[in-house]
């Protein structure tokens, strides 16, 4: 089965699956940006709309997803993990959607490739991006190298310490990595600096935003490029066990990997959608990144969504052992799905994520990224509550090579 994606296939559903013409998911989303960026956002929305109607664009994207990215990614039955979580009342069969096997090691390449093709279509030769864990930065640097585009990556100084391997990879791929020292020197601050760059260079530059956050049309565009994950998973589930899955499980920071898996299933009401946030040191402390669990409505990086903020509306610092989840906001569509009760969201601590990473590594021979480990950790809470045999699909959104130093230090492994 060859992986193909088509905007028409994804978006011929009702309002549950797409924003309004104003870029709203219910009350969330919108365009809270300087006036100088509005023409670029309109241009991007028009370019994306036209591109999805262009067979040549869609065919080129699908060809590169197959021959360059390595899609489709397997749906793998994790038999030892399934056995580990078997209870007296149910056997929860666990399947992994192996986005970690993509070129560059994570789901991020799906969106980076698609947006690079849009940038070329718009005549933009300079690309900027933000990154936390480094995977989006690596993916963006990779596609820029592939197409001969100038590439500038903004990354917080704190994340650079945690993700030195990915920093080297970006530089090796020809990207300029700009260190961000303002604020907490993490993903939020890198995003702010990237937006400042875009405001100053909007005529020549395209900003490849890495998550389903930011001003419209970014949440929609990023979601649509990642929806290939869920489209493949839906077909693979039918082939593997003859039905749709009972539960989809994914980690959530900004929320792109989760939305890519969830989106094609949103109208399938029999399928539970569960997103797992980073509880850090605990949601009752000040050191966490559980935006949906503990946040309130506010505006960040051009979009209205749930945020971690104080009573005066000031954005608070987020904390997670995972650089990719260390963000005080979340994509507006996730906030909407939570409000209407279509998706459920929980959180796990740093310690729980580390335990899950170790468990999956030992039982399946797969070292997941720290971000992904948060989704695996939710199995400890989920499986004991199930009273029947259940098919669970986890989005294995990235591999853990980038995290080995952090994990070794945290687990005291020499």
UniProtKB/Swiss-Prot annotation:
Pathway given in the UniProt record: Amino-acid biosynthesis; L-tryptophan biosynthesis; L-tryptophan from chorismate: step 5/5
Cofactor: pyridoxal 5'-phosphate
Keyword annotations of the record: Amino-acid biosynthesis, Aromatic amino acid biosynthesis, Lyase, Pyridoxal phosphate, Tryptophan biosynthesis
Region spans: Disordered: 1-28
MF terms in GO: tryptophan synthase activity
TM annotation in the entry: none
Enzyme Commission numbers on file: 4.2.1.20
Reactions it catalyzes: (1S,2R)-1-C-(indol-3-yl)glycerol 3-phosphate + L-serine = D-glyceraldehyde 3-phosphate + L-tryptophan + H2O
Cellular-component GO terms for this entry: cytoplasm
N6-(pyridoxal phosphate)lysine sites (modified residues): 108
Signal sequence region: none
Biased composition (Low complexity): 8-18
Subunit structure: Tetramer of two alpha and two beta chains.
Function: The beta subunit is responsible for the synthesis of L-tryptophan from indole and L-serine.
Family: Belongs to the TrpB family.
PANTHER family per the UniProt record, alphabetical: TRYPTOPHAN SYNTHASE (PTHR48077:SF3), TRYPTOPHAN SYNTHASE-RELATED (PTHR48077)
Protein name: Tryptophan synthase beta chain
Organism: Prochlorococcus marinus subsp. pastoris (strain CCMP1986 / NIES-2087 / MED4)
């Amino acid at each position: 089965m060859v992986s193909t994606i088509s905007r028409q296939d994804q978006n011929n559903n009702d309002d549950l699956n797409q924003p309004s013409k104003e870029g709203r998911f219910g009350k969330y989303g919108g365009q809270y940006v300087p006036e100088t960026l509005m023409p670029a956002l309109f241009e991007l929305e028009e370019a994306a709309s036209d591109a999805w109607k262009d067979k040549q664009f869609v065919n080129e994207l699908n060809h590169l997803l197959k021959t360059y990215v390595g899609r489709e990614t397997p749906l793998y039955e994790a038999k030892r993990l399934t056995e580990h979580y078997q209870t007296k009342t149910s056997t929860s069969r666990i399947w992994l959607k192996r986005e970690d096997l993509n070129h560059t090691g994570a789901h991020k390449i799906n969106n980076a490739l698609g947006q690079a093709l849009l940038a070329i279509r718009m005549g933009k030769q300079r690309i900027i991006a933000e990154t936390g864990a480094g995977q989006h930065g690596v993916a963006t640097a990779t596609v820029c190298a592939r197409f001969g585009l100038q590439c500038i990556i903004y990354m917080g100084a704190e994340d650079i310490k945690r993700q030195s391997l990915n920093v080297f990879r970006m530089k090796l791929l020809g990207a300029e990595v700009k260190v961000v020292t303002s604020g907490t020197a993490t993903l939020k601050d890198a995003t702010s600096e990237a937006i400042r760059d875009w405001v100053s260079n909007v005529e020549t530059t395209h900003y490849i935003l890495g998550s389903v956050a930011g001003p419209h049309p970014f949440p929609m565009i990023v979601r649509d490029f990642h929806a290939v994950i869920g489209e493949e998973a839906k077909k693979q589930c039918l082939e593997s066990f003859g039905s749709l899955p009972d539960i989809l499980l994914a980690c959530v920071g900004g929320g792109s990997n989760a939305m890519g898996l969830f989106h094609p299933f949103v109208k399938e009401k029999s399928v539970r959608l569960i997103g797992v946030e980073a509880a850090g040191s605990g949601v009752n402390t000040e050191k966490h990144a559980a935006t949906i669990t503990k946040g309130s409505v506010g505006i960040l990086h051009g979009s209205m969504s749930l945020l971690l903020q104080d009573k005066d509306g000031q954005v608070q610092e987020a904390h997670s052992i995972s650089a990719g989840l260390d963000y005080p906001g979340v994509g507006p569509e996730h906030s909407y799905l939570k409000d209407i009760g279509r998706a459920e969201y929980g959180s796990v601590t740093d310690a729980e994520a580390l335990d899950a990473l170790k468990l999956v590594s030992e039982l399946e021979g797969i070292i997941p990224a720290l971000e992904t480990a948060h989704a695996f950790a939710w199995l400890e809470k989920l499986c004991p509550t199930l009273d029947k045999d259940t098919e669970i699909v986890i989005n294995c959104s990235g591999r853990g090579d980038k995290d080995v130093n952090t994990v070794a230090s945290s687990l005291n492994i020499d």
